[in-house]
UniProtKB/Swiss-Prot annotation:
Organism, as annotated: Chlamydia trachomatis serovar A (strain ATCC VR-571B / DSM 19440 / HAR-13)
Entry protein name: Ribonuclease P protein component
Subunit structure: Consists of a catalytic RNA component (M1 or rnpB) and a protein subunit.
Chain's gene name: rnpA
PROSITE patterns xrefs: RIBONUCLEASE_P
Catalytic activity: Endonucleolytic cleavage of RNA, removing 5'-extranucleotides from tRNA precursor
Length: 120
């Protein structure tokens, strides 16, 4: 039986990985989240990092946001091109899972061909 979690090799874990995507990635705003996307060095690698500031809310709210985003990314990951993405919330509301999945599936490929512009 397979584990229904986002594997560790599908996550950005180190600070330098986040900094690389923040500096070199293209910013794309969706209704619920802000994305920074950079093409992956390896065509099949799809990784996600999630950042949530303390302004978003208490720890349980930040953790819930991260769980929802991880699960949405896990569901759409097979349909995405090779990329590394950093996802941050817009506003203080919890995202809707289905809407977030659709936004990720639509916005990440849109951001990839033009990854040279980093303005948000």
């Amino acid at each position: 039986m397979s584990r229904l979690t986002l594997p560790k090799n599908a996550r950005l874990l180190k600070r330098k990985q986040f900094v690389y995507v923040q500096r070199n990635g293209r910013c794309c705003r969706a209704d619920q989240v802000t994305l920074r996307v950079v093409p992956s060095r390896h065509s099949n690698t799809r990784k996600v990092g999630i950042t949530v500031s303390k302004k978003f809310g208490k720890a349980h709210q930040r953790n819930r946001f991260k769980r929802i985003v991880r699960e949405a990314f896990r569901h759409v990951r097979p349909n995405l091109p090779g990329c590394q993405a950093v996802i941050s919330p817009r506003g203080n509301s919890q995202p809707d899972f289905l809407k977030l999945s659709e936004e990720l599936l639509q916005r990440i490929p849109e951001a990839l061909p033009l990854a040279s512009s980093s303005r948000c």
